[in-house]
Amino acid sequence: MSHSKVAVIGSGNIGTDLVVKLKKLATNVEIAVLVGIDPSSDGLARARRMGIGTVDTGVQGLIEHAEFDEIDIIFDSTSAKAHLVNEEALRTFGKRLIDLTPAAVGPYVVPAVNLDDHLGAPNVNMVTCGGQATIPIVAAISSVTAVHYAEIVASIASKSAGPGTRSNIDEFTQTTSAAIEKVGGAAHGKAIIVLNPAEPPLIMRDTVLALVTDPDQNRIRQSVIDMVEKVSAYVPGYRLKQEVQFTQLDDAESVATLTGGVDKGPGLWKVAVFLEVEGAAHYLPAYAGNLDIMTSAALQVAERIAANTVQEATR
């Protein structure tokens, strides 16, 4: 099967890790060009050593590149504001965009949950690292019972957070909160990110808290386990930290502002799921699971889009 050529915009932590994954793991797509704006960046230097084409003049340089016409899919790993500019510049060329920033121009995509619904979208958004880790769990719970409120806390090593991540904190919380509702299925969602300065750096940890009514604990527990297995198929370091926990709330009134005022009486429970994500250490060390889950999910999306394009063409 012929490979779809792809380009990556952004030569920072995420973009460089994605390039390494594309080179090592991809089966349906082929990395052609890495695009940056700093000629001396480590990412561009590494790409050149790997025999990959590079551009150091941003998206305009990509458009002018000799291989641009052959490129089918473009990953954008810059920042939310930069993606808006890049998307506008690329809009008329008919390229498929996979957005790894919180810009959310296109629909939110979490591969284990809703990728099949958006294989034909011109621009898909990968939400955030915290979203990729936790939204599958919210979706697993909401597939069993109504989730009145879901809150996620993503704790990442400070050393793994580059300038793009740091400049997008507000966008991170807004985009993740919205996707918890739209993709995860929660009635109300909230996201919190913590940059942990601990030394040595700790791997990514994620907590999912959900408020539900009279839960079938066995069904929820099994649904979560099944979802973890689905995610770990493309993010091998993704795992449950401990058993799913259930706590009955004695005073449901205290959470009425979170649940939108529903189910204030007895029967309200808190479901707690604790996760950790260890990176594959393709570019950064294993503690950077937050980068690994984003790039692994994005690679999964590109592989499926490319395969689907071939299937559609042969029908």
Swiss-Prot record:
Signal peptide: none annotated. InterPro entries: Acetaldehyde_dehydrogenase (IPR003361), Acetylaldehyde_DH_C (IPR015426), NAD(P)-bd_dom_sf (IPR036291), Semialdehyde_DH_NAD-bd (IPR000534). Keywords: Aromatic hydrocarbons catabolism, NAD, Oxidoreductase, Plasmid. Transmembrane segments: none annotated. The keyword Oxidoreductase applies. This is Acetaldehyde dehydrogenase 2. It comes from Mycobacterium sp. (strain KMS). GO terms for molecular function: acetaldehyde dehydrogenase (acetylating) activity; NAD binding. It is an enzyme of class 1 (oxidoreductase). GO terms for biological process: catabolic process. Belongs to the acetaldehyde dehydrogenase family. The active site is at 129 (acyl-thioester intermediate). NAD(+) binds at residues 11-14, 160-168, 290. It catalyses: acetaldehyde + NAD(+) + CoA = acetyl-CoA + NADH + H(+). The keyword Ligase does not apply. Coiled coil: none annotated. Its EC number is 1.2.1.10. It comes from the Bacteria.
